[in-house]
Amino acid sequence: MGSLKLSTFAIVVCLSILLISPIEVNGWGKCDLRKGLCRLADTISTCDVPCRAVDSKYHGGECLNVGGGQGICWCCRDYDAAKSGAEKESM
């Protein structure tokens, strides 16, 4: 029975990863990079350090719920940095 729950959880996580598109989190700006799984029970965001290590444009991360006490780390950058980067790319 335990393996059935684990299999169901794995399927939910995989589908969530495939279906979730870049998001905007209130107060965080544009969150457009997934950086692995996180635990929702942690009081300190475990997403901040790995997200900052990816690139200096990311100021931290947010753990968003996918069920079963687990979440997906989304790395976030502020709106101004995202906007100025898009303007530079379009030139």
From Swiss-Prot:
GO terms for cellular component: extracellular region. It comes from the Eukaryota. Residues 1-27 form the signal peptide. The keyword Zinc-finger does not apply. It is found in: Secreted. GO terms for biological process: defense response to fungus; killing of cells of another organism. Disulfide bonds join 31-76, 38-63, 47-73, 51-75. The keyword Cytoplasm does not apply. Keywords: Antimicrobial, Disulfide bond, Fungicide, Plant defense, Secreted, Signal. Belongs to the DEFL family. This is Defensin-like protein 95. It comes from Arabidopsis thaliana (Mouse-ear cress).
